[in-house]
């Protein structure tokens, strides 16, 4: 019997894909978020570590839907654009930016964020 005919192979494949998406997003967001927080925002190492640890559950929740969305965007870009390295990277960047913007907006609105408080804080930092 071939593995592809096994009834559990698609379940196993989806589970493996979801696990890979989750691990990749958590690790990527941990290190890039930490770099942004320390280098651009001026947070201390302790503040950044605390922030990154608190962000892990959110990243775990959005990892599988993001993986599906990213695969669709990259596939669409490779079908309709030149098959070059930069096309895939730009599609990956676009998928990350669009997906994260929408998911973080929902998260912040759910927990009571307001644009006014953010703009006041930004003005005070200048």
UniProtKB/Swiss-Prot annotation:
Cited Pfam families: AlaE
InterPro entries: Ala_export_AlaE
GO molecular function per UniProt: L-amino acid efflux transmembrane transporter activity
Domain of life of the source: Bacteria
Main location per the UniProt record: membrane
GO biological process: amino acid export across plasma membrane
Topology within the bilayer: Single-pass membrane protein
Keywords: Amino-acid transport, Cell inner membrane, Cell membrane, Membrane, Transmembrane, Transmembrane helix, Transport
Record has Transmembrane helix as a keyword: yes
Gene behind this protein: alaE
Source taxonomy: Bacteria, Pseudomonadati, Pseudomonadota, Gammaproteobacteria, Enterobacterales
Family to which the UniProt record says this protein belongs: Belongs to the AlaE exporter family.
Keyword Cell inner membrane: yes
Subcellular location: Cell inner membrane
S-S bonds: none
Residue ranges of the TM segments: 23-43
Source organism (scientific name): Sodalis glossinidius (strain morsitans)
Protein name listed in UniProt: L-alanine exporter AlaE
Function: Exports L-alanine.
């Amino acid at each position: 019997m071939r593995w592809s005919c096994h009834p559990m192979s698609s379940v196993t494949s989806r589970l493996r894909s979801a696990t890979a998406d989750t691990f990749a997003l958590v690790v990527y967001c941990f290190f890039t978020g930490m770099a942004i927080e320390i280098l651009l925002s001026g947070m201390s190492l302790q503040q950044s570590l605390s922030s990154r640890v608190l962000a892990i559950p959110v990243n775990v929740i959005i990892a599988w839907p993001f993986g599906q969305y990213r695969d669709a965007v990259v596939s669409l870009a490779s079908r309709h654009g030149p098959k070059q390295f930069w096309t895939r990277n730009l599609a990956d960047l676009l998928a990350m930016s669009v997906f994260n913007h929408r998911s973080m907006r929902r998260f912040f609105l759910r927990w009571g964020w307001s644009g006014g408080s953010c703009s006041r804080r930004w003005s005070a930092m200048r």
